[in-house]
Amino acid sequence: MEKEIIYPESELLDFNFPTEKPSIIKVIGVGGGGGNAVTHMYLEGAIRDVSFVLCNTDNQALLKSEVPIKIQLGKTTTEGLGAGGIPEIGRLAAEESVGDLEKLLSDGTKMAFITAGMGGGTGTGAAPVVARVAKDMGILTVGIVTIPFLFEGVKKIIQALKGVEEIRKNVDALLVINNERLRDIYYDMDIPNAFAKADDTLTIAAKSISEIITVTGYINLDFADVNTILRNGGVAIMSNGLGRGENRVSAAIHNTLHSPLLNNNDVFKAKKILLNITFGTVQPLMMEEMNEVHDFMGKFNSDIEVIWGTALDQELDDNVKITILATGFGIEDVVPLTEIENGKRKVLENTEIIRKAEGELQNSEEEEKWIRYLLKKYYGEDISAGMTKTRPKPFIFNLNNLDDNEIIDAVISHPPYNRSSQLMLNIARKAEARRAAVAE
């Protein structure tokens, strides 16, 4: 009888090769809005070859979702009860869970989408921390965030815009989806469907970028191409559009340029463009149709960096889909770091402003200018003019000007709601000058 030879497990060859490519992309939903969007993506099954993750302070919200990978943020900070709409609590909860986040991302992840609804507590406060952890690990980090509908109120909108500025500093590229822009386009939609449309729009953004990487094309685009465009790209624009029939490529380009994803940004100011053209089997892309693409690209500056590709999608039939990913905008098109004052360029310290307490912010004229800029950028000039109100500024009289009728008239001639700090300062200076003149 032959002796049975048992080989150590380490000497055996494993012929069970993996049948699926390991996912290098994670889509992470932070907070209630981000979690709803990621749950929507997961259930729709629209995005292939990615991993979905939920991060929330609200344990009940995590339990309700069917997304399998979940992290409860700040078990000690919030005890699973949520952030109560306070971003600082969301931030502290995420800081408590940094170790869990690092472990989550230490599996070969190359790219992370951080999705959140700005304006609440967890999404606004925790999403920048989650993004920072990913970016510090060398992962290509893309934020996709929504900002509120106007009917959600001034306080939430301003809180959301502060959150946008905070996460912008912690991602390679940031896509901002303005829910109010969706309302303008789909004006006849009911409230539940309006929020669902916001989830759909966010899904389209993540899906379009992911498929550039995961779907093999004829002129193939891959992670390296997306990385070139998005790495340290700042504010990004992602948009796509479908075209059908005669001049379908031009129609797709037109629809791309009128997508709600553009959020009123001018795509032609970009320095880097990734252009992907996808077509179906019924009517493949013709060489003649590339003339329409050439005409479109001719509208950009000649020094723009362009990466382009083509791919087949059988579901498109005779449609053509154009996807544009654009970055490299000038800082003046993104954040008001400077403004002209008295003929000189003045630097606005937005970073310091963001970190001040709520009460201090509301009393700061620089903060008010900054908020007005952001409201104008995302919601339009008419909105910004009506949404931020200057708080009444008192004029403090002293013994020297209590009986100065000219100063008294200057103060009472301006209603309290029109009294800015600068106006009160000018009156005070005038009073001091008059007092000095009398003393002489």
Question: Which residues make up each language-model segment?
Answer:
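Tubulin/FtsZ superfamily GTPase core signature
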Residues: 1-440
